[in-house]
């Protein structure tokens, strides 16, 4: 872990621990609210609420996974532990981005499907939505997700040479840079979702629950 000083690594390790605790609490709150909404009669409005809350909870899981994997990287004691954490980070970023924004399957993108439908009904959210959409598109261009690494990490390969080569060529600096860019963007999405909850979900629930 030559890219990080020991002091910086320790400070970051502790900060990530605090962030994980906070996100765990948000996840529990989201699930409590989602369960309450599930108990309401199904209609267009409750469907919108579920979409927002499900999106928010999925983001919590992505954040928890990526922060835990980076924390694992910071605490690694062996070369392979570092490499295992790095390939886990890459897989989480690839799968997280696919779930948030999609690569080619837009029907599976909650940003383009769930959140776009909300923005259509709440124009005050449009400017932030378009700004973040642009950031997500740039992220895919500038923060290249390594598909081969993802595939080898999840499925291995019939040829162990390919897996060994992938592990040997892993760059901690490159993966850390990707993590920084990805986390900044996904945090922006998370803040937008929290704003959406304040505007859409909270006022509705205050009259129903």
How would you name each of these model-derived features?
Residues 136-165:
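Histidine-centered, metal-coordinating catalytic motifs and their short helical/loop contexts
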Residues 1-142, 168-209:
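Amphipathic alpha-helical interface segments
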């Amino acid at each position: 872990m030559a890219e990080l000083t020991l002091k910086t690594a320790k400070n970051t390790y502790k900060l990530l621990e605090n962030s994980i605790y906070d996100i765990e609490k948000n996840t529990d709150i989201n699930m409590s609210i989602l369960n309450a909404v599930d108990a309401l009669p199904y209609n267009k409005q409750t469907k919108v609420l579920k979409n927002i809350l499900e999106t928010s909870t999925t983001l919590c899981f992505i954040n928890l996974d990526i922060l835990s994997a980076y924390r694992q990287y910071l605490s690694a004691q062996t070369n392979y532990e570092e490499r295992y954490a790095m390939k886990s980070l890459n897989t989480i970023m690839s799968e997280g981005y696919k779930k948030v924004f999609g690569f080619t399957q837009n029907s599976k993108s909650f940003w383009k499907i769930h959140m776009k439908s909300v923005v259509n009904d709440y124009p005050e959210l449009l400017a932030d939505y378009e700004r973040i959409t642009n950031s997500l598109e740039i992220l895919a261009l500038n923060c290249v997700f390594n598909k081969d690494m993802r595939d080898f990490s999840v499925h291995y390969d019939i040829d162990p040479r390919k897996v060994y080569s992938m592990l040997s060529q892993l760059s901690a600096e490159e993966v850390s840079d990707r993590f920084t860019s990805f986390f900044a963007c996904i945090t922006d999405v998370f803040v937008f979702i929290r704003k959406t909850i304040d505007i859409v979900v909270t006022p509705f629930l205050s009259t129903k629950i």
